[in-house]
């Protein structure tokens, strides 16, 4: 009897061991700044529930272990969550599976978003989320200066530069600038980039996001506009984004130029405590259209033994209702706005951002004209 029992226990142990060994290990790479930790965690948990036959492990860049290092080290993840430009470097090498058949709602998605996910007429990435920046407005401060009519979204869905000037001048007369900007630095210059793109519709990048066009005449006009308002005292300068945000939340300024998805939740206590009636506005633009500077995050499927399961998971993220709730306001859907790609956080993007920041600071300080500063950026980009 003991021998039979021992044999049964051994059989059970072997069976359990085989079951564990049979589970596929699936690695999901999240690039830096691709997705906040809470969202990534919720997405992974939902994936584990939907695909229990695999062990799902989230990995991120640590030290030098970014996507490039993983690929060159023959340690390719199964799913890659990153900006299109980070993944596009490897598309021609055949490292990713074509995902054309996985996208069932392409007609609803903004064309520039889809264009960013296509290379050589192949969809190499499924779009997940797009981050958009906008301005936060203190409605009560506008009403106090008899400019509450500009907070009417029906009559003023967007402000033209001339209207924006009137607002800035009204607050400057009261010695309380409506808007503050901070030093242009690669980590915090996204709002300046978005403002300069929106003012006259000049894009830092071509529509697909692959090529820099920093010396675009409309970018130059926008930088001249910003320089003149700073020199004239209509726009104030502070030391950091955090300082400008604190002034807005304290009710000291009417506008904050870098309001992002999630800021209302993060700042809810201060907004309520200080009685700020918040509304959001797109950046002012002479085009008459809302200009959306967007930063896209998507998912790629690596070619390999696990690609079938990885492809199912990627499609699941794009369609499952609970996955949609985890992703939140995805920001990829088609509307009447003009969409312009924001400079991404890849090495190439960071180079452009550093050059852009140097050009902005040079122009604002009077060290060079906007035209000369931007021409230097473009010359450097062309030489790369």
Across the structure, where does each feature detected by a protein language model lie?
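Extracytoplasmic "Venus flytrap"/periplasmic binding protein-like
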Residues: 50-109, 145-146, 150, 246-247, ...
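Conserved C-terminal helix/tail region of periplasmic/extracytoplasmic solute-binding proteins
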Residues: 334-384
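Extracytoplasmic/periplasmic substrate-binding proteins
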Residues: 87, 191-195, 199, 220-306
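Hinge/lid segment of periplasmic solute-binding proteins
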Residues: 82-134, 162, 277-281
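Helix-loop-helix "hinge/cap" segment bordering the ligand-binding cleft or interdomain interface
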Residues: 118-188, 202-236, 369
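Extracytoplasmic/periplasmic substrate-recognition and gating elements
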Residues: 52, 269-331, 358, 365, ...
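Short amphipathic alpha-helical coupling segments at ligand-binding clamshell hinges
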Residues: 39, 43, 221-222, 304-317, ...
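Conserved N-terminal structural module of periplasmic/extracytoplasmic solute-binding proteins
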Residues: 2-9, 13-87, 287, 325-326, ...
